[in-house]
Amino acid sequence: PFDLYALIGALIENDKESIEAVASLIGKNYARPQRLLSGAIIAAGNFRQPQFVPLLIKTLKHPHPPIRAHSAWALGKIGGKEAMEALAYALKGETDERVIREIEGALGTIN
């Protein structure tokens, strides 16, 4: 079975073996590390499982703004106190407008 949690962890670490394994399934053009990580983050948000929150908190600090934006969106979908606290903290230091909008939107969806 497919282990999204392990894949996200491997992508955070930029594990070449995992990237190559995915590339063999979907094609090298679609297997760029940042693209794979963004897709995995979106999938994690759609699963809405709290187990992904610690990984998404890590990706919320990624240097690539679209990955931070997707992470904020996913944390908003999952919700919970830990996600809300991480989003509020990230908002304080975020400078990218798109990421700020995603964080604010995510915070608005968490009860």
Stretches with model-predicted labels:
Residues 5, 15-23, 48-61, 80-92:
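Amphipathic alpha-helical scaffolding segments comprising HEAT/armadillo-like alpha-solenoid repeats
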Residues 16-46:
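C-terminal structural cap/anchor segments
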Residues 20, 54, 97-101, 105:
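Polar/charged alpha-helical tracts
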Residues 33, 63-65, 95-96:
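Short inter-helical turns and helix N-cap capping residues of alpha-solenoid HEAT/ARM repeat scaffolds
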Residues 34-49, 58, 68-80, 89, ...:
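Structural detector for internal amphipathic alpha-helices that build alpha-solenoid repeat scaffolds
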